[in-house]
């Protein structure tokens, strides 16, 4: 059987376009978050969402502890937020100066295109990641549309 080097696989998968999100939770020490792009809708009945967390992600045990998290879909122009929440900064520093509000106890980033609130149902091992399955408890967002020559 042929094997593929991890670097080759990563390079090939870099051609797959995906959205960028920040997964957030409200821990006992305050809001926490991490950038994630391995996010997708899993089921409509029941409403389930899937997020992949690196096993070493510092946000993972905090989400596992609270059992609640939010997925903030970033808009064009929010690259700085994506980089900030992907950084190795301590969790308590990531939210310093970041405008957000709490919706049902879940941090929602100002300017996010959309957000989904979830209750963590299951964490499934998947190699060097954990696959988080969340039951959707809230969803908000207004898409930017182009119709008949103007934004709507």
Name the predicted role of every residue range.
Residues 1-152:
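Basic, polyanion-binding surface patches
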